[in-house]
């Protein structure tokens, strides 16, 4: 018999659980202080009431009901209104501030009856208990408390409600719960973490077990924003989006020719090169073409301020300010270090949802990669590209190469495998002078020009000239000239090798 699941309503978490939490069973949500355990349990109840019309009971062993209601308000959840509508009941089991003496044998019979009565009275389908740790802290006999909690869970299962219990742990990767017994009395275990990585906090959620059913394995990043918890279940993303044959212009006619007629409408383009090679200018031309077609576009800038972007675009004859005034362009500027990658991803998704652009640009990915782990950065890129493709948006990303000249790697963070089109921009030294070169390194699903061509930046924007004839190893950082005889000799040698094969 298949286990029925109850959607929590927490964005992304139900994807990790592959449908939600098992119905009529208990789930332990464990984490260190500040990981979001109480927020998780409140969001579970609030979404159940508001989205699934399932009344709930919240049992608090730590904070007072007044504090619970006040804190929930910061996420836009009006618990008092739900209480007034008899859709939510908050049972206060918090300790007496004046202290209390325990006489005789400890049991939770009275509390169990109060919870049972509230469930029946309000016809509750969901219960949240915050937290089990507080119960253990109030009483010394751990084995007795474990027995009583087991009784409580058994009663809740008998009634048929789906329960979420929180518990505190000491270390992010230590024992599941502080007293080492909480996980054994629950059917399911969810772990919330708030790990310090490169001087930044990164929140993750892991479903350790869902008894009798399947779930996704591993840790998944999440954020706590204005509307509560959002989980980024990247592993749940499916490659089911449609693929368009419609072409869009890059804003540079010669580059369109190099790409076989322009970019595909739903493609992700990456321009990579050293600083000053013209990446931001290509972004500006890409955005200008959207405006020319009366399409909306959005820019996420992590290296330059809005004023700098406007000034630079103006120098190329592009009026970003007018585009903004016409409601066809939105510019979001932020320091990469202002928040974590997951929060940046959530901001990008929110802005795209609200503005509904047909094109987006991120300048640059390398700025966001500073001071974060390779895995976290890769997850961010997958999240952005996946969402852009889901919304059928053309995306243009830039990446600043560390090497000023010579070859550089674009595969270290696996960005190259995620993007559809890659433009290589590079400085080259020819006859004692510095020049720029451009090459369409990759274009998925289309013919493209393989030549390395000269790339010139003028007051009117970019110009793409002919290829560097009679030169080879342009991108190696040490180009050298070949004579006409050498070139012809090379052709015959190549033909000779083919004949021998």
Swiss-Prot record:
ATP 1 binds at residues 34-38, 74, 209-211, 213, 215. It holds the Pfam family ATPase. The modification Phosphothreonine is found at residue 417. Mg(2+) 1 binds at residue 38. It catalyses: L-seryl-[protein] + ATP = O-phospho-L-seryl-[protein] + ADP + H(+); L-threonyl-[protein] + ATP = O-phospho-L-threonyl-[protein] + ADP + H(+); ATP + H2O = ADP + phosphate + H(+). The keyword ATP-binding applies. Gene3D superfamilies: P-loop containing nucleotide triphosphate hydrolases (3.40.50.300). SUPFAM superfamilies: P-loop containing nucleoside triphosphate hydrolases (SSF52540). This is Circadian clock oscillator protein KaiC. It comes from Prochlorococcus marinus (strain SARG / CCMP1375 / SS120).
């Amino acid at each position: 018999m298949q286990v029925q699941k109850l959607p929590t309503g927490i964005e992304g978490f139900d994807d990790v659980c592959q449908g939600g939490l098992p119905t009529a069973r208990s789930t332990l949500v464990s984490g260190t202080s500040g990981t979001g355990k109480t927020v998780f349990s409140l969001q579970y109840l609030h979404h159940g009431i508001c989205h699934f019309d399932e009344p709930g009971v919240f049992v608090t062993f730590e904070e007072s009901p007044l504090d619970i209601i006040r804190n929930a308000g910061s996420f836009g959840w009006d618990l008092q209104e739900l209480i007034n509508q008899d859709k939510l009941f908050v049972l206060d089991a918090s300790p007496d501030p004046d202290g209390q003496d325990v006489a005789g044998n400890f049991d939770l019979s009275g509390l169990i009856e109060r919870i049972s009565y509230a469930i029946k009275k309000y016809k509750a389908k969901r219960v949240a208990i915050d937290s089990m740790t507080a119960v253990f802290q109030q009483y010394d006999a751990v084995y007795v408390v474990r027995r009583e909690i087991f009784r409580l869970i058994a009663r809740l299962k008998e009634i048929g409600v789906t329960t979420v219990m929180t518990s505190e742990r000491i270390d992010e990767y230590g024992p599941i719960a502080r007293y080492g017994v909480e996980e054994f009395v629950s059917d399911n275990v969810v772990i919330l973490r708030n790990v310090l990585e490169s001087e930044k906090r990164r929140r993750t959620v892991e479903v350790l077990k869902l008894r009798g059913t399947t779930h996704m394995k591993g840790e998944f990043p999440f954020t706590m924003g204005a509307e509560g918890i959002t989980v980024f279940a990247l592993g749940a993303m499916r490659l089911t989006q449609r693929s368009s044959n419609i072409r869009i212009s890059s804003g540079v006619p010669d580059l369109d020719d190099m790409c076989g007629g322009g970019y595909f409408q739903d493609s992700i383009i990456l321009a990579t090169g050293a600083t000053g090679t013209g990446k931001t200018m290509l972004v500006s031309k890409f955005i200008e073409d959207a405006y020319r077609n009366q399409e909306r576009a959005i820019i996420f800038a992590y290296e330059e301020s809005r004023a700098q972007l406007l000034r630079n675009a103006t120098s190329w004859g592009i009026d970003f300010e007018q585009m903004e005034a016409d409601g066809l362009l939105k510019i979001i500027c932020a320091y990469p270090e202002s928040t974590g990658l997951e929060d940046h991803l959530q901001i990008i998704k929110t802005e795209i949802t609200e503005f509904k652009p047909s094109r987006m640009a991120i300048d640059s990915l390398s700025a966001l990669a500073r001071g974060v782990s390779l895995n976290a950065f890769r997850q961010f890129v997958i999240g952005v590209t996946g969402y852009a493709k889901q919304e059928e948006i053309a995306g243009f990303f830039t990446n600043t190469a560390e090497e000023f000249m010579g070859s550089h790697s674009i595969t270290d963070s696996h960005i190259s495998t995620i993007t559809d089109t890659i433009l290589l921009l590079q400085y080259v030294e020819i006859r004692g002078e510095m020049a720029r070169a451009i090459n369409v390194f990759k274009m998925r699903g289309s013919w493209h020009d393989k030549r390395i061509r000269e790339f010139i930046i003028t007051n009117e924007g970019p110009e793409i000239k002919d290829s560097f004839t009679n030169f080879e190893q342009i991108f190696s950082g040490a180009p050298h000239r070949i004579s006409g005889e050498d070139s012809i000799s090379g052709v015959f040698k190549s033909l000779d090798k083919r004949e021998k094969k």
